[in-house]
Regions:
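Noncatalytic luminal/extracellular "stalk/propeptide" segments of secretory-pathway proteins
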Residues: 22-30, 50, 54-162
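Soluble metallo-hydrolase cores and metallopeptidase-like ectodomains found primarily
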Residues: 29-31, 106-143, 206-285, 297-300, ...
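Second-shell loop/turn segments in exported
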Residues: 32-40, 54-64, 116, 127-132, ...
Length: 472
């Protein structure tokens, strides 16, 4: 009898854990499958990115087009039928690009195709170029060895579906200028953090370490980096770099938010979005007009249902991601203040890796175990789109990162980025690079995910924690 009592007690002890498992009802799964097929045939996503890139164009944070982009986003949310539309201010330092030139001087005189790195100061410098194969080689250079010279880091990125080598290419851009200056350099140039063979350089933000006096810093197009490498192999090569750019006070932009109100738990939200800003060279189609369009279209399709999902779908067009995740940080500060806020954050996902087809899915949080069943259910509805469930992979998108760092649950919808760094941060980032069918597949995936996450009977593990958001 005692053994039976112990067994019953053990069973009862397990019951709360079983009850806490997050699952999704069959009816919601059927609705999601219908939404998936509807999204594949829908053209809203492409129409939205076409509108943004055509009517607004390049939209560097704090620039002339920034307020036009904000007005565009508000109007687009309203025209797509979102129940609520509002803005939240985001302030940041303002950086401007005006002109940029570089040239080899001397016996082999010729122009070089370059672009200033975001955050670079203006100025004209001229000096002998010293080539380094990678960042580690620059870091190993003796102190003072670059006095009066221009450092050239020639790291060549390789293509990958997940873009994993961007960690190395991006590190050259973010750390290289400060490292060069510490060695005595008067300027810095790098092979673009890209995988293309076109004569279009890739920009991107750089940071100068505290105590370092900033110097002009620029990226060469890939062919120009090859040319400069050949010239330095021939012997001493001098370059003149002339940049007119720099910081100019502060600016205020806005996170633009559209919401489909939930039917029974309207204060609990599923957050999806992309960043509204872009660099100023192209029209920001893949980075990140596509992400804005994908998530706006997903919210729109869910909003057309006769019955709204249980929780609200919140689509955020984030401000100034490119220069330091300012929009994501501001969102986390406003909506992740305490445990009560975090309890209302069901889950979040950002589309910010172009418009290639989504091939993998996962979710994560501070307490993920109870939501594994629901994650698998979502994955089953995504599977016909060619999307695999990868339970040990993934992470939050850039602008979702700050609220995830505070304990918010995240979803990972991995896009094929094989060709992403051919275009990233270049003048070639234009609408014609987007495949409408691939974009529709993205819309279908985000629609399924957002709807089912909003319909789940339980949460995905958001738990408040005292962790600082990532810096960029």
């Amino acid at each position: 009898m005692r053994r039976l009592a112990v067994a019953i007690s053990a069973l009862l002890a397990c019951t709360p854990a079983l009850a806490a498992q997050t699952t999704i009802a069959d009816g919601a799964l059927r609705t999601a499958a219908q939404l998936r097929e509807q999204a594949l045939a829908d053209t809203t996503g492409f129409a939205v990115v076409e509108s943004l890139t055509t009517e607004v164009g390049p939209r560097i944070a704090g620039g002339e087009a920034d307020p036009r982009a904000v007005a565009w986003a508000k109007a687009k949310f309203q025209s797509l039928g979102f129940d609520k539309v509002w803005t939240e201010p985001v302030s940041f330092p303002k950086w401007q690009r005006r002109s940029e030139q570089a040239a080899v001087i001397g016996a082999h005189a010729q122009p070089l195709h370059i672009t200033a790195l975001g955050g670079s100061p203006g100025g004209t410098v001229e000096g002998e170029v010293v080539r380094f194969e990678n960042l580690a080689a620059l870091q190993a250079a003796p102190a003072g060895s670059l006095a009066g010279k221009i450092a050239f880091v020639d790291y060549q990125m390789t293509k990958a579906r997940d873009g994993k080598d961007y960690g190395n290419g991006g590190a050259v851009r973010s750390k290289g200028p400060s490292e060069a200056i510490r060695k005595g350099a008067i300027g810095f140039v790098m092979r673009s953090a890209g995988t293309d063979s076109h004569r279009v350089p890739h920009t991107g933000i750089t940071r100068f370490d505290e105590g370092v006096t900033p110097a002009p810093a620029a990226a060469l197009s890939v062919p120009d980096a090859n040319q400069l490498a050949r010239l330095t192999a021939l012997g001493s090569t001098r370059v003149r770099l002339a940049l007119d750019c720099g910081w100019d006070g502060t600016a205020t932009s806005y996170n633009v938010i559209g919401e489909i109100t939930g039917r029974s738990k309207p204060k609990e939200v599923v957050v999806i979005g992309g960043h509204l800003d872009s660099w100023d060279l192209g029209t920001g189609a893949i980075d990140d007009g596509a992400g804005v369009a994908i998530t706006m279209a997903a919210g729109h399709l869910i909003g057309q249902l006769k019955q709204a999902p249980k929780r609200s779908i919140r689509v955020v067009a984030f401000a100034n991601e490119e220069q330091g995740l300012y929009g994501g940080k501001a969102y986390a500060a406003a909506h992740g203040k305490d445990a009560k806020d975090m309890a209302l954050h069901q889950i979040g996902a950002e589309s910010d890796f172009g418009a290639g087809r989504i091939y993998a899915f996962n979710t994560g949080s501070a307490a993920p175990d109870a939501s594994r069943a629901a994650t698998r259910q979502i994955a089953e509805v995504l599977a016909p789109l060619g999307i695999a469930y990868e339970p040990s992979k993934g992470g939050p998108g850039p602008d979702v990162g700050p609220i995830s760092a505070k304990g918010g649950a995240w979803a990972w919808l991995a896009q094929d980025g094989t060709d992403y760094f051919d275009l990233h941060h270049t003048a070639d980032d234009t609408l014609d690079k987007i495949d409408p069918k691939a974009l529709a597949q993205n819309v279908a995936a985000y629609t399924v995910f957002a709807y089912l996450a909003a319909e789940a009977d339980g949460d995905f593990g958001s738990r408040a924690k005292s962790v600082q958001p990532p810096s960029e």
